[in-house]
């Protein structure tokens, strides 16, 4: 009588099959890991590129701007003392100078290096003090000066405050924002933006910002010497502060 015999794999064959399966699993895991890593790299690259193309816009500070409706000449000597410190030096500030003709200049403010000056500028801008004033003094290859409610170069907010000269900045390039003054520690509301390097001003005027956008608008400002001009300077519609 015959018997049906079932052959079973040898121990060696079973081990080889198990090893083959383990290697197949490892291979699939490695492929899956590589795919995930590649997708992660692509996602990070896309995020970085998006951040570069679309920088944080920040928030425009809006409020009543109580002086915006007051004739600029009436604002002359409107205040009796400098403003209290209200800016947050842990944040970043920008100023957007919007011209009446539609042009716009954007400036980064150096609140870490010149907090008192930036605080003053932010306060006046938010009050509407600069709305409707002009760039009353614009000299070729030198600077464009504004911020005077009288429009003559002699006006101001009614107070003065000290210089901040130890900021680490020098007048070594175009587009620097600085305070105009009548001597040491006589800052008020008037400011200027340089057209070129002006090293002879080093140590005399507080630098508190720099132009980041709108160089063409700066370049297009009408040249004007207040001592001889018969027409008013280019009008500033408003200066808006952006907080980041």
Predicted region positions:
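Cyclophilin-like peptidyl-prolyl cis-trans isomerases
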Residues: 1-244
């Amino acid at each position: 009588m015959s018997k049906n015999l079932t052959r079973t794999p040898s121990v060696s064959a079973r081990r080889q099959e198990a090893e083959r399966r383990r290697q197949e699993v490892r291979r699939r895991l490695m492929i899956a890991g590589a795919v995930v890593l590649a997708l992660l790299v692509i996602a990070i690259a896309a995020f970085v590129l998006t951040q570069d193309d679309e920088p944080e816009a920040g928030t425009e500070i809006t409020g009543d701007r109580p002086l915006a409706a007051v004739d600029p000449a009436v604002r002359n000597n409107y205040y009796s003392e400098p403003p209290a410190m209200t800016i947050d030096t842990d944040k970043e500030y920008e100023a957007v100078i919007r011209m009446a003709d539609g042009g716009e200049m954007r400036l980064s403010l150096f609140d870490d290096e010149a907090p008192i000056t930036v605080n003053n500028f932010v306060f006046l801008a938010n009050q509407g003090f600069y709305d409707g004033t002009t760039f009353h003094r614009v000299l070729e290859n030198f600077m464009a000066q504004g911020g005077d409610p009288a429009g003559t170069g002699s006006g101001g907010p009614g107070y003065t405050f000290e210089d901040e000269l130890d900021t680490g900045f020098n007048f070594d390039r175009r587009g620097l924002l600085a305070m105009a003054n009548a001597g040491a520690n006589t800052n008020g509301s008037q400011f200027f933006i340089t057209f070129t390097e002006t090293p002879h001003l080093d140590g005399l005027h507080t630098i508190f910002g720099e132009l980041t956008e709108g160089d063409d608008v700066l370049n297009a400002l009408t040249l004007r010497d207040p001592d001889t001009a018969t027409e008013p300077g280019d009008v500033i519609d408003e200066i808006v502060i952006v907080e980041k």
